[in-house]
Amino acid sequence: MGGGSGPSDEFANILPHFSQVDSSVPVSSGKKSRRNTHVACVNCSKWHVSCEAKRPCHRCVVKGLGSTCVDAPRKKSKYLAGIPDASLIRSVHRDNGSQANNSSPDNAGVSHHQEQQNFRDPQHIVHKSKFLSNAADSEYSILSHIINQDTLVNKIPIDLLYSGKPNDNDAEAAAAVAAKEAANVDLSSPKVDVGPSNTAMSSTDVYSMLLGPNSREIVASRIDLFQNHFPLTPVESQYHSLSFKRLPTQDRSGSPKFNASINQYYLNKEISMLPEVINAAMRQQRSVGDKSVSFALECVSPDAYQLSGNSEWRHSLRYSTSMEIYQLINEPFSHTTGFHHLYTYLRKRFNRKDLIEMSGCLAEFRPIFIACTASLTEQDMIFMEQCYQRTLLEYAKFIAQIGTPTCVWRRNGQISYVNEEFEILSGWNKEELLNKMTFIVEIMDDESVRDYFKTFAKVAYKDFRGSERMKTCNLLTPTRGQIIPCCCMWTLKRDVSGLPLMILGNFMPIIA
């Protein structure tokens, strides 16, 4: 064993060969090494020459351009084309090491700490990079907030999602300030009539039915009822029956209608006394000559059957002619506010288990929503609102003739039209449903609301059928504790991208 060569002798024979290798000659490997790439500065990028990572770079220092040596802006992605740089939201990275080079090191840690706090702030939501349309981007953002399953890393405040306009961005803040000031308002002062002016019902009566016992404080605070949601308030009834006297007639004017061509007055159901008509005729200061005035008692004026839009009801039929629709609508309808208040309303009404189930229904169509709206521009969204108003104008003519209780609502559940038969069936009149932000789920019982979200997720984005039926849909009446069992047939109207534009619900009562 002593004469055998050990391992050290074997290495001794090999090492001389390594010592003869020239270290100055690079050893070629099978895989070619890759050079590090750096973002060129604006000057080197303009000259199309190589640049280094440090700022200012050596080339700019030599040429005396160190003050202007900054990273060249990168080319925008296609989905960010047309969006100003000032409105783009700075990305939030989970890792400090992935911060942009142009951000200073001293404030990088502070901004990262603030962003981490924003992840725990309920007033911020996880958000995807902007769509081509602010309206579509805002609607997707609030949907992501509702289902609470977004894994993207951009965050913006909720109050910045409602609109691109400054006066709409702070709607929530203004509403909160107005609510605080409401306590100092003198309730003995006259009412502020913020409702439509073409109704005979006083604002006191309308808003007392809309908002309940706190109606005076809410109206006096000048809160926008179309941007802030207040649930409907059913009342107690000792007779346990609906009072259909709350239903106003179609002719809601306070004075009798007069048709000069036939020299005749039309009297509504509120004015049927002859002295009232004579006094109204004298006030009009009209010269009738030798003709005698005729009266049609309990006969509604033909003008009452003409469709008239209300421009103050932004979610409803706003205009009465197609020319007005195409000329006056110059901004898209924001579904974001409606989705936000719908989620707030559901949280107050249902438990956590029901909310998770409803959020799961909303999460099913979120990827389809992204695919359909990512390429839509602001002009596309304006065109969709024009289509909605134009379609609703035509449907209103048909709905007025069929005599079936019908309610029309948007994809966020916001009611935008009801006919007289639906008012009679449910007991809610048009002013109560359209004079504020009202959701279709507000007038449904709990089981019907659960079925509503399942049906909506089924037909809205997955099964592109034009109709669906809810076998049982129990409507809540203005009388607390009383419901009307119905069968509801849905008819869906879609826009050019396949998204649900409006839903028409025909309600037929189930007679036991």
UniProtKB/Swiss-Prot annotation:
Residue ranges constituting the PAS domain according to the UniProt record: 391-463
Keyword Glycoprotein: no
Species name: Zygosaccharomyces rouxii (strain ATCC 2623 / CBS 732 / NBRC 1130 / NCYC 568 / NRRL Y-229)
Disordered: annotated span: 95-118
Name of the gene encoding the protein in the UniProt record: ERT1
GO MF annotation: an example: RNA polymerase II transcription regulatory region sequence-specific DNA binding
GO cellular-component term (any): nucleus
Keywords: Activator, DNA-binding, Gluconeogenesis, Metal-binding, Nucleus, Transcription, Transcription regulation, Zinc
Main localisation: nucleus
Residue spans binding DNA: 41-69
Residue stretches of biased makeup (Polar residues): 97-106
Official protein name in the record: Transcription activator of gluconeogenesis
Biological process according to GO: cellular response to starvation; gluconeogenesis
Pfam families listed in its UniProt record: PAS_13 (PF24990), Zn_clus (PF00172)
Entry-linked SUPFAM superfamilies: PYP-like sensor domain (PAS domain) (SSF55785), Zn2/Cys6 DNA-binding domain (SSF57701)
Family: Belongs to the ERT1/acuK family.
Role, per record: Transcription factor which regulates nonfermentable carbon utilization. Activator of gluconeogenetic genes.
Subcellular location: Nucleus
